């Protein structure tokens, strides 16, 4: 996986995991600013598929790529799952947006996420 992309993921999820430990009132105060800051950048990184190796990894290992042969890095449903995942790490499970995503879709997305974060070798 591309070094810059993997580094971005590491720091993003490390920060979101840390934020989950902070007082709920503090999280609520920064709820929307955090989403506006991180969600667009996360989507940009996930849609960035000009790297041939990254595209090959997704096409080989991704469950959802078999359902999305257009080559887009994420389906619309998966974009919604990214938002739900961010809400989870911010400790805002009760504020999930209902996008009609079933449990199997969540499992497939998290399986893809493991591929994105995996270190080669």
Curated annotation (Swiss-Prot):
GO CC annotation, single: membrane
Membrane topology: Multi-pass membrane protein
UniProt KW keywords: Membrane, Transmembrane, Transmembrane helix
Residue spans crossing the bilayer: 26-46, 72-92
Localisation per UniProt entry: Membrane
Keyword Transmembrane: yes
Protein name: Uncharacterized protein YGL088W
Taxonomic source organism: Saccharomyces cerevisiae (strain ATCC 204508 / S288c)
Lineage: Eukaryota, Fungi, Dikarya, Ascomycota, Saccharomycotina
